[in-house]
Structures are given as C-alpha cells and as structure tokens.
C-alpha cells in the first residue's frame, strides 16, 4: 500500500487542511470521551511545528445536511482543542469561500455535515474544500470507509493529498496483523450476531490459526456443534455457515459457560458445563475453565486480532471471560491489535490499554479493512500517490 505521508512533506508556509475524526460524545456542551481528540493531537501539533497554516475539519453526529444544529456543533471540540493545545482554536462557521490563516495558526471548521453535498461526495463541494488548501491530509481512519466530500472528494481535487500519521499508523498496524502475520495467529471475534460479522469471520478464517468466537456468535457455533443453547441469542439459519467456517479453521469451543435465567444486571450467574445448559438458560459469558484455556492459546500466539467482548461484561458477574482474555492479550508477547467500540470499552474497564500493541480508532472502517474491503478514502490516496 503506497500513499504519500504527511511526515515526508515540507509544510512550511503551506495551507494544510487536515480531516480528523472528532466525532465524540458531547453532553450539555461538554466532551464526554476525548479519545478521538487525543488521537488527533500529534498530527495537528506536527503540522504546526512544520510551520503550516492549519485548518482542521470533521463531522459530528448525524445532522440534517445543509442545516446548522447546535447539538451537532463542533464548538465543544474547539474549546477542548484550545485547552489541549494551549492556544485559541477558533471555530469557523463560514469557510467555504476562503479563510485567512497564518502559518503557526490553527482553526477548526464547523461540522462538515452542515454542508450540502458532503455525504453525497458532491464534486462542487469537494472542489471548494480543495481550493482552501495547498495540502490535504486525510487522518480520519474512522471515516475512511465512507466516500464523502471531506474524506474522498477533496483528496481527488487537492493539489497534494496525503495520509496523516494516525491514518498511516492504522494502515501499518492492520497490514502487519493481516498481510504477513507472525505465527501462530489468533483472532477473537465476538458480538451478538454471526450475520453482522460474517465477512469478518470468513476473511479471518483464511488468515488465522485459531478463531476464538464469543457472545451470540459463539452460541451459533455451539448449536452447530450439536450443543443446546437454551434461550440464548443465536441464529438458527446460520448454523450451516458456522459449520463451514469451523471446517476451514480451528474454532475452539467453550467447555463451560456462565448462564442466567434473564438478561439483567441483577441476574444470578451460574457456571455450567457446556452439556448442562438447560432450556431456560441464557449463556452470557464463557466459564472460568474456558477462559483459562483460551488465555493459554493467546499467551502462545505471536499475532492477536481482537474484536468484541466474549461476554456481557457491562454486568460484572458476566465479565470474567472478557477480563481474563484482555489480561492474557496484555501479557502475551504477541503483536496485538484491537478495534471496535465495545472492545475499547472493555480495554478501558480492565485497564490493559498500555499493553496492547495497537488500538484502532475506527469501528466500521476497522471491520471493513479486516473483511478485505477497499476503503475509499485510502484508495484515493493510493491513486494520488501514483
């Protein structure tokens, strides 16, 4: 994968437009989770150090296109950036007809989704973005799977289009895990439905040595192996699909599980052997014996890709499986990459973030890359680098 990188460019005196993913949760005008903003700071700081006039843009939420809405304004993000950078970061509402930014200055453009044509990737809007800058930097891996005006269109028309450090690091880490992984490779894919992760499971079954499944996905694989899953969430129509995947790659199944009679925070947890699941049981986590076996697998792996918690970890009595696996990944010498919103929440909860080689900032983009799909915003950077 060959793309031009911002780190290789001379930006002195240049007008640089950086597309970041600053789509963060905001409540009552205050940023509630700053992870994406923190991830973008090194890129913004580097552009300033290189002497660029810096313009930053992003979307936030899903406003009605072409209409301003206060709840989707980037004002709280501008305030946060001002504090984080130790300088005022003005929020510009009107910018499509040109802005005055001096080298060493940084401004934030208001939500790109307030602009008509953003989601449809309209050429006219993309050309207006491109006219604002000498160099366009795509740094938002989290939106790289969407062909929109500020992620894809602008890269077609800008004088120079390159990948920012955050995007470049994501592509490098994912490439390392998927293109030429050190063996043995283990993948953990968990979630409520096989149907939503079918492409991920199929793709990983061709690259990994061990495919650990969890959540509702594991229940479908258990049913495929002839076990009773009681009232657990599973997809009867995908049992044959699960069998086909299990025929291609080693899918270790739980030997014990944690069950409850109801899906509730107050539900009583009971550990049962896999062949003792009753008709009115719901499987809500892997059991301690299974967690220990899977942990050993992970500790002996050299590449680990993790997407999804293996139990309902939001309820502590069903969180042990995810906790044990998270700690095993952290203790493993493997190159480990983790992605997906629930996975990041689990990493935070169990405090293992420092020990995971790479934590992806992209949810949908992470999954599409793992599926082997082309990310439009990356493809256009490759075209421009030719």
From Swiss-Prot:
Associated pathway: Carbohydrate degradation; glycolysis; pyruvate from D-glyceraldehyde 3-phosphate: step 2/5
Annotated positions binding ATP: 197, 314, 340-343
Location relative to the cell: Cytoplasm
Keywords (A to Z) from UniProt: ATP-binding, Cytoplasm, Glycolysis, Kinase, Nucleotide-binding, Transferase
Keyword Transferase found: yes
Binding-site positions, substrate: 21-23, 36, 59-62, 113, 146
PANTHER family found in the cross-reference section: PHOSPHOGLYCERATE KINASE (PTHR11406), PHOSPHOGLYCERATE KINASE 1, CHLOROPLASTIC-RELATED (PTHR11406:SF23)
Protein family (similarity comment): Belongs to the phosphoglycerate kinase family.
HAMAP family: Phosphoglyc_kinase (MF_00145)
Name of the protein described by the UniProt record: Phosphoglycerate kinase
């Amino acid at each position: 994968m060959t793309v031009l990188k911002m780190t290789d460019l001379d930006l002195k005196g240049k007008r640089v437009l950086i597309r970041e993913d600053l789509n963060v949760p905001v409540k009552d005008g205050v940023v509630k989770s700053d992870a994406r903003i923190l991830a973008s700071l090194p890129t913004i700081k580097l552009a300033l150090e290189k002497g660029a006039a810096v313009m930053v843009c992003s979307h936030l939420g899903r406003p009605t296109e072409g209409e301003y809405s206060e709840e989707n304004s980037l004002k709280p993000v501008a305030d946060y950036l001002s504090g984080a950078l130790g300088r005022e970061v003005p929020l510009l509402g009107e910018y499509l007809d040109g802005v005055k930014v001096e080298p060493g200055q940084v401004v934030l453009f208001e939500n790109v989704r307030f602009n008509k044509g953003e989601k449809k990737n309209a050429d006219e809007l993309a050309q207006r973005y491109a006219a604002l800058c000498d160099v366009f930097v795509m740094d938002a891996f989290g939106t790289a799977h969407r062909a929109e005006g500020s992620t894809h269109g602008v890269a077609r028309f800008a004088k120079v289009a390159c990948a920012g450090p955050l995007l470049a690091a994501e592509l490098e880490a994912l490439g390392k895990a998927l293109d030429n992984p050190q063996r043995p490779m283990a993948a953990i894919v968990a979630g409520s439905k096989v149907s939503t992760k079918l492409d991920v499971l199929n793709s990983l079954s061709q690259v990994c040595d061990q495919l650990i499944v969890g959540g509702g996905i594991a229940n479908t694989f258990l049913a495929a192996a002839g076990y009773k899953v009681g009232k657990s969430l599973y997809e009867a129509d995908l049992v044959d699909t699960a069998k086909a995947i299990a025929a291609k790659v080693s899918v270790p199944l739980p030997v014990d599980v944690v069950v409850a009679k109801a899906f509730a925070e107050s539900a009583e947890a009971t550990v049962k052997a896999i062949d003792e699941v009753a008709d009115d049981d719901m499987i809500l986590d892997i059991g301690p014996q299974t967690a220990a076996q899977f942990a050993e697998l992970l500790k002996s792996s050299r590449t680990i890709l993790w997407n999804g918690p293996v139990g309902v970890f939001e309820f502590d009595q069903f969180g042990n499986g995810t906790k044990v696996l998270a700690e095993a990944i952290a203790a493993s010498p493997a190159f480990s990459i983790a992605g997906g919103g629930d996975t990041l929440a689990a990493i935070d909860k169990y405090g293992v973030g420092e020990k995971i080689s790479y934590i992806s900032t992209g949810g949908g983009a992470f999954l599409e890359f793992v599926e082997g799909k082309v990310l439009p915003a990356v493809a256009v950077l490759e075209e421009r680098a030719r």
